[in-house]
Amino acid sequence: MKDILKIILDILYPGKCPVCHKIPENTENMICKSCWSRLDFVGKNYCMKCGKPVLLEEEYCEECGRRRRNFTQGRSLLIYNETMKASMIRFKYGGRRQYGDFYARLICMFGKKQILEWNPDLILPVPLHRRKKLARGFNQAEYLAKKIGKELGIPVVSHVLKKVKNTRSQKKLDAEKRRKNLRNAFAANEDFTGLKILIIDDVYTTGSTMDEIALVLKGKGAEKVYFFTICTGYN
């Protein structure tokens, strides 16, 4: 019965390509063949700490090279270029949940090996403040996390990490202002003693969000805090 319902829904409401937002030639692939070539994957040369692209001879990006990180390690799948910026805006603010289906599948395809090497006990999504979640209708990181957790068999917990401070937008803030903006913005109400935790989000920029979350989780006993995101900015 569920399979029949899915077929009917796919016919009535076919999924849209996350890049051009048109119906793909093959809806099972979830992306147009021509749009696939527009995805700019992070290559083999990346920061050993945060996963940002770096030059061949560099081990760390500029930011990770000059300051200590609270998180253990992180990786991202794609470069945050103009194509991905438009896709992420539609995903987050346009309620395009089907984009999350595609990106979660992509992370599981290309990031599975790394995630399983980290061997996390739990997956936590980056939380939204309740006002922002109400305005958007959903938390894109939570949607991604649940899809990834289900595929990889890792428990996902959404209610233990909260955004308690309704911070202003980070878009136009530099790294230092982002850190100040996020100070004391998150809180956790569980004990994570000895646990390895994987944080899921859509975009990694300066690392301020991941650092602040890792600080909170380690304060609650977490042994290691990793992250995986769809996109990352340039070094």
Give the role of each language-model region:
Residues 1-200, 205-235:
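Glycine-rich phosphate/pyrophosphate-handling loop used in enzymes and phosphotransfer proteins
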